[in-house]
């Protein structure tokens, strides 16, 4: 079997609420850390989410 190209990552809110999303990314095409602007329901606004490892 071949090695999987997608890995699971955790997108953690930069608003320091502790809220996070779990998503997948292709590790071969996206080598840098992922950042996305998504909705944080605890902060009640759109904030930037940064990639961290799932523990």
UniProtKB/Swiss-Prot annotation:
It comes from the Bacteria. InterPro entries: Ribosomal_bL33 (IPR001705), Ribosomal_bL33_CS (IPR018264), Ribosomal_bL33_sf (IPR038584), Ribosomal_zn-bd (IPR011332). Keywords: Ribonucleoprotein, Ribosomal protein. GO terms for cellular component: cytosolic large ribosomal subunit. One of its GO terms (molecular function) is structural constituent of ribosome. GO terms for biological process: translation. It holds the Pfam family Ribosomal_L33. Belongs to the bacterial ribosomal protein bL33 family. NCBIfam families: PRK00595.1, rpmG_bact. PANTHER family: 54S RIBOSOMAL PROTEIN L39, MITOCHONDRIAL, LARGE RIBOSOMAL SUBUNIT PROTEIN BL33M. This is Large ribosomal subunit protein bL33. It comes from Brucella anthropi (strain ATCC 49188 / DSM 6882 / CCUG 24695 / JCM 21032 / LMG 3331 / NBRC 15819 / NCTC 12168 / Alc 37).
């Amino acid at each position: 079997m071949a090695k999987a190209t997608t890995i699971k990552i955790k997108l953690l809110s930069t608003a320091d609420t502790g809220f996070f999303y779990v998503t997948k990314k292709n590790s071969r095409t996206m080598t840098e850390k992922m950042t996305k602007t998504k909705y944080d329901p605890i902060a009640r606004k759109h904030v930037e989410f940064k990639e961290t490892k799932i523990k």
